[in-house]
Amino acid sequence: FDVCSTVDCQAYKGAALSNERSDAAAEETRGVYLYYNGELVTNAVYYSCNGGASESCKNVWGSEVPYLQGKLDPYEASVAWRFSRYYWSFTATGDELREVLKSEANTDIGQVQNVYVSEYSDTGNVIAVTYEGTRGSYTARREKCRTLLNGVYDHINVRSMRYTVTVGDASTYYVNDAQSSVTG
């Protein structure tokens, strides 16, 4: 298959879960290709849930692709109830964030003193997050804003580029989807 079952390919769950509808859709689109300005699109990307806005390729992977531009998606919020992972949040301690930065960004900023979104895209997605500590600071940019925190601790999972960061007490940070609020 050309599609994997990870977040790289989104929601594909393997041939074992195919059914009449999915088989018919595959058959109906056999031989159909996607073109942009007469050129075959060789890197068609998608996602199952965008949090309310897509994002420009330059803000995710750093290169400009004319057909991958960010747009607000008002439809998304109207069907959010259909997506079990649309609303999400997690809490992380300063010590956890420090360990993530050490292991995933190969940097030790010391005791974490502050974390904040330092840049938003035109569509309101996070494209830079700054971590400040007693030994310096580190700024994660583009896709790294999302992927940096994933995979080190089971309870930490940034599911999209559309989120907020809220500082709790001196050592607690709340991260949640852009539609939810944090209390605590």
Cite the ranges covered by each PLM segment:
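Conserved, single-site charged/polar hotspot
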Residues: 1-184
